[in-house]
């Protein structure tokens, strides 16, 4: 059985066979865990009040689903919404106090002309009867889900003080067919699985997608040339560039925080080592030189150092080395197997695939209070490839269930989990993208 470590797959040039699937499908979300301590919030249906064709997107449903899957909120079920105000002046706060709601969101959708819509919405503190937020947004019909995610982000941030990450994207790999007829696709979708987009198709395995910090490009590993090679690809235009095809392993690309460099694992000198490539000049700098296997680099948020997986101590653990090279320091000490690090935006948390015997789960090391504390985020037996949301509120990872691959997103406090699954296939290699910016 394949262990959750990309460098083992790279060394043996093997990939676990995946079952048939429809690659154009979006991922569907199934919340499989919740929290009784989540904050109650009523998201009232927002009716279309225009005279043209109503938008297909149910704005309030998207906003409510976003808040639910964050684990921080618990929306009021539709059957319990006894009143449907569309503006603050219509809100009867005592009704919502009786229903034990902490917050209420109301709004409406109107025509904005030329096929566009205007959404006006307000957020209220029920106990105080005070408005916390009042905004209006305009978009065309095909961007109404984007608007809905941005609304959820604003509501989330206003209440929690933490920037929301609903209007973000995820990358993942799918496959179809069996044996020699396998076909792979690198996909990008909204963080809730909608709007899937095929970035590249291949008859050979695709691995290790990694986002550029501006969200415009993906780096990934392809075996289409027979050996592993690393490509950069523009998501909007499809233009791609081959940046590494040395003899041996070319693996685990990771963009620097400024987007100018790429960390990668190469075995060009015989043993897998960590290198940094200047993407302008293509000049390589070797950071490690050890008889052990060094792989899976990921940058610290300040760009000053790189975390990586190494078995130099006998078993895979996470180490850290300066981006300019030098001696490496071991970071993880709990457990015999820690690999595939993902680092939170503030550098205080590190999510890893942690192994014990034949069981691999996602664990998180939190250094917020100084000395490291550990927590287990996933309950599976073969969980791998953790990837933090840009606000570190959730971790996306891959799992095996019923003989096929699925994705999970778990809150960083492990209170809520959600499964992202294709209707009839496998999905692996997740990577959560950066914040998006409105144009």
Swiss-Prot record:
**Keyword check for Flavoprotein:** no
A Pfam family that this protein carries is TolB_N
| Signal peptide residue numbers | 1-22
Asked whether the keyword Cell division is assigned, the reply is: yes
Q: Which UniProt keywords apply?
A: Cell cycle, Cell division, Periplasm, Signal
Q: Name one GO cellular component term.
A: periplasmic space
- Where does the protein end up? Periplasm
Predominant location of this chain? periplasm
Q: Which domain of life is it from?
A: Bacteria
Q: Which family does it belong to?
A: Belongs to the TolB family.
Task: Outline the subunit composition.
Answer: The Tol-Pal system is composed of five core proteins: the inner membrane proteins TolA, TolQ and TolR, the periplasmic protein TolB and the outer membrane protein Pal. They form a network linking the inner and outer membranes and the peptidoglycan layer.
* NCBIfam families (UniProt xref): propeller_TolB (TIGR02800)
Cited function? Part of the Tol-Pal system, which plays a role in outer membrane invagination during cell division and is important for maintaining outer membrane integrity.
Question: What is the protein's name according to its record?
Answer: Tol-Pal system protein TolB
From which source organism is this entry? Xanthomonas oryzae pv. oryzae (strain PXO99A)
Traced from the root, the source organism's taxonomic lineage reads: Bacteria, Pseudomonadati, Pseudomonadota, Gammaproteobacteria, Lysobacterales
């Amino acid at each position: 059985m394949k262990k959750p470590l990309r460098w083992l797959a790279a060394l043996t040039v093997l990939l676990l066979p995946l079952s048939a699937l429809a690659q154009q499908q979006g991922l569907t979300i199934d919340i499989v865990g919740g929290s009784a301590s989540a904050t109650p919030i009523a998201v009232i249906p927002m009716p279309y009040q225009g005279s043209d064709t109503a938008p297909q997107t149910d704005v309030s449903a998207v906003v409510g689903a976003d808040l639910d899957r964050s684990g921080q909120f618990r929306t009021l079920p539709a059957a319990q919404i006894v009143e449907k105000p569309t503006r603050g002046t219509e809100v009867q706060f005592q009704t919502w106090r009786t229903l034990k709601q902490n917050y209420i969101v109301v709004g409406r959708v109107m025509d904005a002309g030329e096929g566009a819509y205007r959404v006006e919405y307000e957020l209220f503190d029920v106990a105080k009867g005070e408005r916390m937020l009042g905004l209006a947004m305009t978009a065309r019909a095909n961007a109404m889900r984007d608007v809905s995610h941005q609304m959820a982000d604003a509501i989330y941030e206003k209440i929690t003080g933490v920037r929301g990450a609903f209007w973000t994207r995820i990358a993942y790999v799918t496959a179809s067919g069996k044996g020699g007829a396998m076909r792979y696709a690198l996909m990008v979708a909204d963080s809730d699985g909608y709007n899937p987009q095929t970035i590249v198709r291949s008859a050979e395995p695709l691995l290790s997608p990694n986002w550029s910090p501006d969200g415009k490009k993906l780096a990934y590993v392809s075996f289409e040339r027979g050996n592993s090679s690393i490509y950069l690809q523009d998501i909007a235009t499809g233009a791609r560039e081959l940046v590494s095809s040395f003899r041996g392993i070319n693996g685990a690309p990771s963009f620097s925080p400024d987007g100018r460099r790429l960390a990668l694992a190469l075995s060009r000198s015989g043993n897998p080592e960590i290198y940094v490539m200047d993407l302008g000049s293509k000049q390589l700098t070797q950071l490690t030189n050890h008889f052990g296997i060094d792989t899976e680099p990921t940058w610290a948020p300040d760009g000053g150092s790189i975390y990586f997986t190494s078995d130099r101590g006998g078993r895979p653990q996470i180490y850290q080395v300066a981006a300019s090279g030098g001696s490496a320091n071991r970071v993880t000490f709990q457990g015999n197997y820690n690999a595939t690090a993902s680092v939170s935006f503030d550098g205080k948390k590190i999510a890893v695939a942690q192994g014990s015997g034949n069981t691999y789960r996602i664990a998180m090391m939190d250094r917020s209070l100084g000395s490291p504390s550990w927590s287990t985020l996933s309950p599976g037996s073969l969980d791998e490839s953790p990837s933090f949301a840009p606000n570190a509120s959730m971790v996306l990872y891959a799992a095996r269930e019923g003989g096929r691959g699925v994705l999970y997103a778990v809150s960083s406090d492990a209170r809520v989990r959600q499964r992202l699954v294709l209707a009839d296939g496998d999905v692996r290699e997740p990577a959560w993208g950066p914040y998006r910016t409105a144009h």
